[in-house]
Each structure stands twice: as structure tokens, then as C-alpha cells.
Amino acid sequence: MDHLAHHYHAHIAELNRRVAEIVSREALSGLVIHSGQPHRMFLDDINYPFKANPHFKAWLPVLDNPNCWLVVNGRDKPQLIFYRPVDFWHKVSDVPEMFWTEHFEIKLLTKADKVAELLPSDITNWAYLGEHLDVAEVLGFTSRNPDSVMSYLHFHRTTKTEYELECMRRANQIAVQGHLAAKNAFYNGASEFEIQQQYLSAVGQGENEVPYGNIIALNQNAAILHYTALEHQNPARRLSFLIDAGASYFGYASDITRTYAFEKNRFDELITAMNKAQLELIDMMRPGVRYPDLHLATHGKVAQMLLDFELATGDAQGLVDQGITSAFFPHGLGHMLGLQVHDVGGFSFDERGTHIPAPEAHPFLRCTRILAPNQVLTMEPGLYIIDTLLNELKQDSRGQQINWRTVDELRPFGGIRIEDNVIVHQDRNENMTRELGLA
């Protein structure tokens, strides 16, 4: 933890620098950042799992306590208004005593509706950052999530501090242990539900603590891109396993995917080819490279796989130009990663929020940035047998280029995705996922 504490000092200094710059530019007194409030289920007395405002958890790892506030201006010591009610029904968060607390002036809030007593006396020139605009209005904030401030913060959030990079390494390290446990469970005959339990046990995190709903897909379920159902019964025949699952560390996410074949067969060879292509694409990452160019290069590699494995005929570029590869690889190559799984800033050209749109032929690409040092991105090429997309090819002449017999043979396996989390450095790439032990 000492190593992390050392980096945290510089992290807070950088966040203060960013705040000082943007509040000066916008003639604001400062920012008031709300952790959030509980959300009550309709007609019930149970709350949905609480998720802290990412702008709040960028400053400190308070992840599970609603009704907290940060008051920052970039000059004075940041103030943390920490919610600690008198409550005999629920567990009350302890007053924090960790390495980061020395960087904050901490005030305790016992009643959420009394926060005005602890906020600046005149907040008309302070900007509110958070989800609950109705609360901000009642409190008297006239500036609520101003576009200029949000765009500035989102643009700079793509450049990670050393503290953030270390948190993300640890999030990867934790997730790798879960992936190894899940792989072992698959080969030992576990169901999707049982694999999920093995994964969560290995990472030591509950379903509401991991950064997103795990995808645990056996056989044809792997063709459903965001499959989060968990079948309790095993399929009649075990063919394949796709797992897309991450872990959290101090609010930072990992996002890792692997695909396995139960037996050595053609599908297993296709996984090997995809793994090779993915590593080649990662080798192409460097500062100055346009991420959309990497995405287009992925389509070239997918096209070659379609030819090599006799899924399609023609030439590779023609398969890309006609949109045939998009039927087999319909999603983007990857995205920014950080406090959020699909982290902000992926389309920002500058700190004013100028938008870089995805290519017209690839609308699902989640990042269009030019790569720069200390950015963290996922690299997740895939190839799937998705009937709804392939059926569109049957409607025109493109269907004549598809070897439907091979498609039928591979359909029961669902699909393939391989995803690593990569830090772009000035002179190299750091593939956290591989370097921390997941082949």
C-alpha cells in the first residue's frame, strides 16, 4: 500500500491542477461533487445497488457510501463531507482511516438533508457535478454539470496518473485469478451458474462489486454479445466457453475476455488464429496511432480468417468493403478503460469536447481517439456466428460468398472474443492482462 500511497500524492496534485485550470477558465469558485443517492425500487423499500459517481471516486476510493460530497477548487485542501448517519437498521460506514485521508479535510454529515450546513455558504458560483440535478437545484446551484467542465474533465481522464495505472494493474491481477478459476471450472464440467460462483469466489468480489455483469457463456450462448443470463443446467454437449469478466480495485475496472474450446478441433484452431491476430494488433498500438485505424486493421484480419477457415470466398478487402466482416465481427475493437468500463473521453478531440464520430460503416466503435501515453484501452477482436446478422447477407448477393456449411458447423460454438487491457507508454505497450499471468 505504501507504493500506492506514494503515487496517490501525485494523483491528488494532478486532480487539483485540473480543477484549478478549469474553474479559472470558467470563472467558477470551484466544484462540488456528489457521490450520489440511493435509488429505491418501485413500490418497494429496497434500494438498487449503489454506484458512486465516477467523478467522485476519481478522488478517493469511497465506493459504497451515498450522500457524500467533495468540495474542491484546486487551491485549498479538498473537503470531504462524509455521510455517517445514526442508523440501527443498516451498517454505517466507519470514518475513513487510510493513506488518502491526510489529503482531505473531513466533515461528518449525520442527516443527508442537512448538507447545506456543510457546503460553502454561497454556492451560486460553484458548479455541481452529479446525477441528482433536482437536489442541486434545491440547494441553489445554478451551474449543474456544465458542458465545458465535463468535457474538460472527460478529455483529461483518458490520461491516467501513476496511481490510476497501479490500481488498474491490481484490478487485472485480481481478475486474472478469477479467469483461471473459471477456466478450470469449465473443463471440470461446471454449469454457467457454477462457473460464475467460482469466478466471484476467486476474485473475492460479489456480483455488485465487480465492474459489470459477467458474461459466462457456454456453446451457442457465446454468440450473444452481452449475454448475462446464467443457465443452471449444463448443455447436452460441452463445446465452448466464452468468459468476459473483470474486477474492481479502488474504483478502477479491469475488463478481460477469453474463449476456450472443450476439445481440440477446428474451433480451437480458430481461437488460436484470433489470439495471434489480437497480439499483432496490440503490437501496432503506439502514441500517434488512430484507434479507428486499428479497428479497420482488425477487419482485415477477420477477413483473412474467414478465407483461411473457409467461412467465405473472395478477397479480404472485398469482404471488408461489402460489410461481410461486420456480420461476423459487429462490435468495436475496444474502448477506453478506467473508473468506468466504457470510460469517458473516447470520442473527444480536445478538452472542449469536440466530437470525433465513429466511421459511418462502423457505428459501434467506442473509441476514435489518437493514442497517447498513459491511456488504457481494451483490445477485443472477435468472430461470431450470429444468425440475425448473417441472415441479412442471405438477402442479397453477398450470401453467395458465404460457405453456409461451415457456418452451420461452427454455429453451436457461438463465437470467439479475446480481450486484454493495455497501457500505452511512450516507448512500449504494457499488456497488463498477459503480463499478470493470463495466456
From Swiss-Prot:
Its EC number is 3.4.13.9. Mn(2+) 2 binds at residues 244, 255, 419. Signal peptide: none annotated. Mn(2+) 1 binds at residues 255, 335, 380, 419. InterPro entries: Creatin/AminoP/Spt16_N (IPR029149), Creatinase/aminopeptidase-like (IPR036005), PepQ_N (IPR048819), Pept_M24 (IPR000994), Peptidase_M24B_aminopep-P_CS (IPR001131), X-Pro_dipept-like (IPR052433), X_Pro_dipept (IPR022846). PROSITE patterns: PROLINE_PEPTIDASE (PS00491). GO terms for cellular component: cytosol. GO terms for biological process: proteolysis. Pfam families: PepQ_N, Peptidase_M24. It comes from the Bacteria. The keyword Acetylation does not apply. Binds 2 manganese ions per subunit. Splits dipeptides with a prolyl residue in the C-terminal position. This is Xaa-Pro dipeptidase.
